[in-house]
């Protein structure tokens, strides 16, 4: 097999990476014919670097000349935008040389149109295995669905599930590794489980003396903090492991630094942590995800509504799982407050939604503008309080899951008739204390 080489093809300060394809390229008098050629161009220290398969020096030189013309055409059309840590291959590729690597990844772990794992393999990185979080490596499993270890059919790599028989890599999993890479898109909400997976991966790295490299990604809800700070002495679970607000306003890289710096890992341990930050990002950036972070957050609006509507998972109401608009509506078969109707069905990512095949009544929140959600920048408690009042005669409106999502106080406050303003006021002391902690670990200009 021909070797893979890396060369600089000249400074271009435009978009960090893209894929070029030259179909049926033939070089006269070279003795070679290429039916399919593919080259990755990635930024390394503000230059474009191309990874190509070496065939012949003379041919390679002519081929790069041809591709440079194509690069200039594409680059002229590209504007500067947010760059994720994964896109900055030049920042972390040297760290991987000669090392045995595991990657904590899912469908969001992309470098432009290529998956990070595919990109690393193409560059000759020795990827030994993949650790998969909730929803799996390819992001197709239901929320809460336990997954078994398996083999990825596309790469042949073993996939170790961190949402099955165990949620923390074992010593045996870590034994043959020199480094772990974590690259998963989070949404900045405490009960979204990717930060809990991060916690357990960091613990495993600390306990087994394996360095962790976090490739940072923007937080689409990173422009505010809100909600009750969880009292982990009272309530601690996989949907709430740390004393942070429901909306914490940190990227996954900043969050990892906080877990390390505040000694929140078991036994106060710290792992050897490196974070590759994003570029062109601040906490005032409204970042729309290029790929849905999980099956039931398919749109930017659903991501923005998730902190508010996620609380309804602690009730007997539906958040429209099993429809084309999960987390963009709320309802119940007996919630006759508006003419809107929807019927959940078994679909990929929601095989057994609440009220499967039963018509629900409620509110369609897709009419709320993105601008208003971004401007409001806070959890909406009114929907939850109003729904409770409507069903107040039903003692099973709330379920025990709400305490794990929000802590035990929120249910008590609503049942006692506290207003939204009164409940919000009760959060302020905890939010102020958390803000002091948070500021120590920020990598980006704050809102």
Predicted features by range, described:
Residues 236-306:
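Conserved anion/nucleotide-ligand pocket segment
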Residues 148-177, 189:
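Glycine-rich oxoanion-binding loops at beta->alpha junctions
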Residues 32, 37-38, 42, 46-82:
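Bacterial Sec-dependent N-terminal signal peptides
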Residues 139-144, 213-235:
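Glycine-rich, charge-decorated loop segments at or immediately adjacent to ligand/cofactor-binding or catalytic sites
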Residues 326, 330-428:
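Conserved functional hotspot residues or short segments at active or partner-binding sites
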Residues 2-6, 21, 25-27, 34:
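Intrinsic low-complexity, disordered N-terminal segments enriched in polar/charged/small residues
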Residues 128-134:
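Short internal beta-strands
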Residues 279-356:
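Glycine-rich, aromatic-lined ligand/substrate-binding cores of catalytic
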């Amino acid at each position: 097999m021909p070797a893979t080489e890396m060369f600089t093809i000249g400074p271009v300060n435009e978009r960090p990476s893209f894929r070029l394809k030259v179909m049926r390229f033939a070089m006269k008098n070279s003795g070679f014919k290429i039916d399919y050629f593919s080259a990755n161009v990635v930024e390394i220290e503000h230059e474009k670097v191309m990874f190509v398969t070496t065939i012949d020096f003379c041919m390679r030189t002519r081929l790069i000349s041809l591709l440079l013309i194509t690069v200039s055409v594409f680059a002229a059309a590209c504007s500067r935008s947010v760059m994720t840590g994964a896109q900055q291959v030049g920042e972390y590729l040297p760290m991987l040389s000669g090392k045995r690597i595991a990657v904590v990844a899912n469908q969001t772990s992309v470098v432009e149109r290529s998956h990070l794992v595919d990109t690393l393999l193409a560059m000759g990185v020795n990827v030994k295995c993949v650790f998969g979080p909730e929803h799996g490596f390819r992001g197709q499993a239901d929320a809460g669905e336990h997954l078994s270890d398996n083999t990825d059919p596309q790469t042949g790599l073993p996939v170790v599930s961190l949402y099955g028989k165990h949620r923390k890599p074992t010593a045996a999993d870590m034994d043959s590794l020199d480094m772990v890479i974590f690259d998963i898109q989070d949404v900045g909400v405490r009960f979204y489980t990717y930060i809990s997976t991060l916690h357990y991966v960091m613990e495993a790295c600390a306990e087994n003396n394996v360095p962790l490299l976090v490739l940072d990604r923007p937080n689409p809800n990173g422009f505010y903090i809100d909600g009750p700070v969880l009292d982990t002495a009272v309530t601690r679970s996989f949907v709430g492991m740390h004393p942070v607000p429901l909306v914490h306003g940190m990227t996954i890289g900043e969050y990892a630094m906080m877990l390390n710096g505040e000694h929140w890992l078991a036994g106060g341990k710290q792992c050897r942590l490196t974070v590759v930050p994003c570029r062109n990002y601040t906490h005032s950036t409204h970042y729309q995800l290029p790929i849905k972070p999980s099956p039931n957050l398919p749109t930017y609006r659903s991501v923005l509504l998730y902190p508010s509507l996620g609380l309804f998972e602690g009730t007997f109401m539906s958040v429209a799982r099993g429809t084309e608009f999960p987390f963009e509506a709320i309802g119940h078969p007996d919630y006759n407050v508006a003419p809107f109707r929807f019927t959940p069905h078994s679909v990929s990512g929601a095989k057994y939604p609440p009220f499967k095949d039963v018509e629900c009544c409620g509110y369609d929140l897709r009419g709320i503008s993105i601008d208003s959600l971004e401007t409001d920048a806070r959890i909406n408690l009114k929907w939850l309080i109003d729904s409770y009042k409507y069903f107040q005669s039903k003692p099973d409106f709330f379920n025990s899951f709400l305490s794990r999502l929000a802590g035990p106080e929120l249910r008590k406050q609503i049942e006692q008739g506290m207003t939204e303003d009164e409940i919000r006021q009760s959060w302020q002391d905890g939010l102020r204390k958390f803000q002091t902690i948070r500021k120590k670990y920020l990598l980006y200009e704050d809102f």
